[in-house]
């Protein structure tokens, strides 16, 4: 799919860029629930994407120094049970992020994607780009996941007049 890691990193960067518009919204705009976004707020969308970026950031940190990643194994266990527990987990993650100060939500959302890209530059490509299970999970938690949530992003931005 990708000839080199840089190709993925550029695609991921481009795919995430539209979501950075959430950082330009006021705290009040980020807290406004919307029907067109499954009742989510901008904060909820930031949390939802952030959780999975964070999980892959942990995987990348481990893969940078070892060929195996316990964090990846945990992620695979979550994905295996997703059909049964996905809504429950999403609600849990949403509640965890709702308890954070908005400044922390913004910090995580603005820094973790870049940190993930940075770590992936030092992970040997054989451990993520050329390893089909890792690549499939990475895509599912980044570029494909972003695409899945573009409708919510559009609704949130439209409600804020953007």
Question: Predicted segment positions?
Answer:
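Hydrophobic packing residues in well-ordered alpha-helices of helical domains and bundles
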Residues: 5-12, 42, 102-109, 135, ...
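Acidic/histidine-rich alpha-helical segments that form the ligand environment
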Residues: 12, 78-126
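Alpha-helical bundle segments that constitute or directly flank the non-heme di-iron/ferroxidase center
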Residues: 1-30, 51, 55, 147
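Short, mixed-charge, low-aromatic patches
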Residues: 2-5, 13-17, 64-77, 103-110
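Short amphipathic alpha-helical segments at helix-loop
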Residues: 1-4, 37, 94-101, 130-134
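Short, contiguous alpha-helical
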Residues: 31-84, 118-162
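Terminal low-complexity, poorly structured segments
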Residues: 5, 18-21, 85, 112, ...
